[in-house]
Each structure stands twice: as structure tokens, then as C-alpha cells.
Amino acid sequence: MSLKKKIAAAFIACAMTLAVVPSAFACTALYVGSDLTEDGTTMFGRIEDLGTNDYNKLFNISPAGKHTAGEVYEGCYGFTYTFTHDSYRYTARRDDNGLGVCPDCDSTHEHTPYEEAGTNEKGVMVSATESLYGTDAVLSVDPYVDNGIEEAEITTVLLSEASTAREGVALLTSIYDNAGAAGGSGVFIADQNETWFVENLTGHTYLALKLSSSVVFMQPNIAAMGKIDLDDTDHVVASANLISVAQKAGTFVGDAAANVIDLDASYNGDIASDRMAAGLNYLYGTDTFTKDNYSETDFAISNVGENGAIVPVYSNIQLTKKFSVEDSIHFFQTEPIGKTGNVETHLFQVSATGDLNTAITEWTAFDDDVYNAFVPYYPMLTTDTADVYKVSVHKVTRSDEQPTEGVWYQDAKGRYYTYPDDWTDSFYGVRDALSNLLTYGSNGNQVTAKDRAAAKASYAALQQEIMADYADMKAAVAAADPLEAKQAAATNASNAMSQKVYNTTLKMYNKLQAKTAARAWVSSLLH
């Protein structure tokens, strides 16, 4: 069983008994409708969290035709899928199996490891997944399917196959109907015209909702959907058994006669989260929320109005201002949403008007968002990603004993991690190394609060540089002609920004390593 599967199994057991969210699998998603943003774009994205990670992440382009019509794809854990046409080209953030072993399933068979998010050549965007967990009661009626689709396959299959968001929704829900799901999840599927969010909490149930332009919601591993009228067929796609499974489990909350279900209450229960409280404080511009003084059901998504009528989707979260892309970035940087357990973060910014080639911007970041700068890419124009995103490196070595050589750190649970010699050659590796140095120190040497403040300030300044670079990139792309010139302008600009983040991070890491070692040497002389 892989690390992710083990963590997920432990999470389910914990959630069933204690109804708390451990940090090891603690992703957080955000959606802000276009009516609520400064420039009228829709913004949505997610942080992938994995506690203390020991393997590399990549960001690359999956070429068109990587999978061929009729090819049977075998995923990590037994799920198979037959491609209906040659696969589309798409951007992808993914786990690194470049040295032959998949870090998800520990397998060497040829397959694409977990891909978290991306955009295909048709302009379809997928973010998968926000891990969700049904209660033991509903899972006893409709359990997860061992060889059903799992998060490691969702992005790969949907971006390879779907030409519109609705096609993606139809494909994913048909897979849930037939093959089933290996786990619960929340998935964004979008195109230039619409954004859908799909939640499943058992093996074969699901609810897909077309999101409105006037809603904002966040999701820290809890079902985001509350009271939903399933008769709103223009905006809702639901499994035929959604109500009946909850009824059989004895957990149904809603009005079956009116075809209304409270999904969160029926399938997920009320789970306290310090990330939800922190996110609400950020969105409201206050510090009054704690995980003990709110109910996440108060902020769940609904399409049912006060009089029971179907209304545009809302969440009861009220922003204090129109959001900019920097506001969305700062949301992900808010602790404990941002933390050393972050693995990668992606934020899609989508304009409903204009040329599709520039209507979608992917903002990408790796590792700890507290100390980070996000880089923009035009996925429809990008022909390649920066070389530092594509470097395969060895895994970090874990141990219960203090290492006697190499560069290592000890995490909060007392476990030791030693970096391979090539770790900082990759974009993810150097970002991870700096984050762990700022959080845990290195080789027993600690950093100071002043060091952490300086790192935050450096990344804040770097983000402002990137925002200026992004403005220059937009102007250069607009002026370029023909299409090949636009592609070159976009690709070169984004890759230069990525290289700038890498170079800055490596310099900060090496400087801070030397500083902590010097402090330790001086301290040893004094004592």
C-alpha cells in the first residue's frame, strides 16, 4: 500500500471515530465567482497537502497523442480505462516517477503517476482532488471500490478525453456509476464558459453542481455542498441513488418528496477545521472565527432559498471587497492553510470573454505557501515548462535514528529526513528544502523568527516582481503575431519567472544553511 493510500486509510478511520481532520492529508480549495473579483475573472484552485513529503513533484506538458484510441490505461491501484480517442495535449503537475518507481503505488508498471491539475488544448481545466470521506454509516451501504477510479487517475483521464467541462462531468460521473470510486473527492471541472464542482463520498454516489458567478466557497477536506434541490437540472447532476443510500444508512437529511438533500449533513457530518476558521477570518477580514465557534454547514453551498425555491448557488460567505488574484494567492498563504505540509498549489484565473489562448491563466507554486511566489502560465500558449520543473530526483530517506552524514532535518514527530545529493536540482526539491529549513532547522541547527520574517519579505518582494513580469508578458503576447510568436512570448516569459523563483530560493537556502551552521559553530565555542 502506498503512502497516500495509507494516509487515506488512517484518515478515514480517524474521521469515523473522532470527526477531526489530521494535517497529513489536509488539502484546501477555494472558488471565487466572477461577480466577486476585481477584473471579472473566475478564480478557483487548491493546495495539495501531504504532511511531510519525501518525493519530488514535476510540472510539464503531456503531449497530444500520448494515449491512443483504444488503449487500455492501467492506473495505480487497479482502475482501467479505454481511451476513446487519441489524448489531448495538457499541462500537468504530477508526482515524479522518472527514476522508474511510482511514489503513489510503489509500482514500476508504465503509467502516469498522480496528476493534480492542468488545462488541455480544448481549454478544459481539472483540479483533482480535494480528499473527502463519507461516514461509516453511508460507506456500509455503498463502500468504496478497490479498483474504482482514484485521485491518481482523474486528472489524467479527464484532460485526455474531455473537450468541454460538461463532457468532463459526464465522463467522471459515468465512471462513478460503472467502475465506482476508490475514495471520496471534490473535483473542479471547468472551461471558459462554466465551472462545475463534483463531490462523491461513497463508492457510487455523487453530486455535481454548476457554480454561479456570485458564490465564494472554501473547502478544507469537508463536503462543501449543503442543501441542494436536485430538480435544478440545468445546474445539478446527481446519482440516482444519492438520496436512497443516505436513507438506507439512516443519515438522510432533507426532503425526499421534494427531491432535496443536505449532502454534507447526510454523508459527511460536521467536521471542525482550524483551516476553515482561518479561511473565514481571511475572507471576512476578521479574527473572530475559531474551529470551536462555527458550523461549516452554515457556509455550505446551497441552491435552496428561504421559501424553498431554487435560487442561484450561494454559500453565505460574504467577501468584504472585490477579490484580486493577489487576494486569492494570499488566501493560500494564510496559516495554517499555508504551511510546510503544502506540496503544490494551483490557481486558475478564467475570463469568460476574449481569445481562449489568453483567457486562462494558471498560477503555480510548489511547497510551503507561507514562503512562496506564484508563477503565471498561459496553458493554451505554453509549449514547454521550465527545465527545473522537469528534473527527476531521488527520494528523501526517512529514519527513526539521527543521521550521521548528509543534510537532514527532524520533523515535529521526531522523524529524521536526509536529502539525496540531487534534491535541490529540482524546483520542488529546493522549495521543499528551504521550507523545511525555515520550519525545522537543519542538522540540529535552528533558524530564528528574524530569519522567517526575512524569508516572507523576500518572497513578497519577489511576487511583486512577478506581477510586473506578468503585465509585461501579457503585453508581449498581445503584440506578437502569428500564433507561434505568441507561444514563444508566453512560454519564454513564464519560464523566466519560474527560473527566477528557483534561483532566488536556492540562494536563500544556501545562505541560510551557512548562517545556521555558523551560529552553531559560534555557540559551540561559547559553550
Language model regions located:
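Accessory, solvent-exposed terminal regions and/or long lumenal/extracellular loops of proteins
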Residues: 274, 278, 282-340, 430-450, ...
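Charged low-complexity "KEKE/polyampholyte" interaction tracts
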Residues: 369-370, 379-527
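Bacterial N-terminal signal peptides
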Residues: 11-19
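A contiguous strand-loop segment
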Residues: 27-150, 171-296
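Long, well-ordered mid-to-C-terminal structural blocks that present hydrophobic/aromatic surfaces
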Residues: 294, 299-401
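Bacterial N-terminal signal peptides that target proteins for export
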Residues: 1-11
